[in-house]
Each structure stands twice: as C-alpha cells, then as structure tokens.
Amino acid sequence: MTDNPFYRYKNLLKEYILPNAIPVLWKNWNDPRRAYHNMDHLDRMIKQLERNVHNFSRSEFEQLILAAFFHDAIYNPRDPQGNEDKSIQFFRRVYIGKNERFDLVDKAIECTKYRKRPSPFPLKVFWDADNAGFRDSWDSFLRYENAIRKEYSFVPLDEYKKARIEFLEKNIGLFGPKGDINIKKLIEYLQNI
C-alpha cells in the first residue's frame, strides 16, 4: 500500500487540492484505457523525483510532486496536443493553496510538452523523471512502447509507425548513450514489424 503514490502523498493532496478532485485524479490515473500513462508511470516518475528530494526546498519538492500527479491528469491520445494545457487548467481549478503560489506546477507540466530538456534545474529534474524510460533496460523500453501502442491502437499501424519513428528521431541525443541505443533499436524494431 505504501508504494501507491496516492497513499504516500495523501496529506499533500488534501492540503492543496479540493477533496472532490482527488477521486477524479485517482480515476484518471487508473483508467483502463491507459496502458502507459497510468499509475505505474506516475509511481516511476515520483520515485525519480524522490531521489532528488535533497536538491529542493520543501515548497519546490511539493510543487514537483503535485505537478507529477497532474502532468498527465488529462490524457487523451486522440488529442495529444491539448493534454498538458488541459492538465494545467484542471490543476488550477482544483488548487486550494491559500498562501502559496505554485507557479512551478504549471511550468513543470508545460515543459513536458517539448522534446528539449529545460535548463532551470527543477524543470530539468521533472522533465528527466517524466522521460526516464528512455534510459531503462531494452526490455522495459520495449514494454513501454507496446503500452503506448495500445493507447494509440485506433491509429493504423503504418501511420503509427511513421509518426512514432519521427517522434523517436527527435529524441536522439537527449538521453545519453543508453537512451540513444534504445531509441535506435526501437526505430529498427518499428521498421521491421
């Protein structure tokens, strides 16, 4: 139970989020149509952030954790260009912090739209946490790819492969040698299925 981020951060969520929004977040992250952008992704991302807790003030860390909960709170593969903006709007609607401004939450969610590592340190750590799968083992990386394909199963395979390869090519050079090996291997895999 303690591995569940909603359990680990229940007090943080209760402090800053409208009570009726927490079950909505839970439902969204557990939507059965989400094969990759689900609770496992959220948990992996938060664990990456927790490894860096000592690098942040309490306020920064809390904002990054909230941003993790909200960065894919709204996720629709049929309209992927609007997901981050809708997630930010959702956060703004349900945020109840009275005395603190949580601009870092918006900025962190916003930075996940782009295939460029941001330079401000908190945003860089957040972006890296969201994209940590690029550096995972090949088996894990392929498992993530298969999950993403399930989310886009409505797209014909040839169209999916073309768009996915274009996306992957934009990521070469962003994640070091391990990431590049995975990306190139996945491109080859997609070209041959």
Task: Go through the PLM ranges and name each one.
Residues A21, S57-Q63, G97-C111:
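Acidic/histidine metal-binding catalytic segments
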Residues M45, F61-P77, S87, D106-K113:
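His-Asp-centered metal-binding catalytic motifs of divalent-metal-dependent phosphohydrolases/nucleases
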Residues D79-G82, F141:
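Cytochrome P450 core scaffold surrounding the K-helix E-X-X-R motif
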Residues M45-I46, G82-G97:
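An active-site-proximal "capping" alpha-helix that borders the catalytic cofactor pocket
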Residues L12-N28, H41:
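Short alpha-helical hairpin
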Residues F56, N76-P80, K98, K116:
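Amphipathic alpha-helical interaction segments
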Residues D3-L12, N30-H37, K47-R58, E62, ...:
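Divalent metal-dependent phosphate-bond-processing catalytic cores, especially two-metal-ion Mg2+/Mn2+ enzymes
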Residues L18-V24, Y36, Q81-E84, N99:
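Short catalytic/metal-binding and nucleic-acid-binding patches
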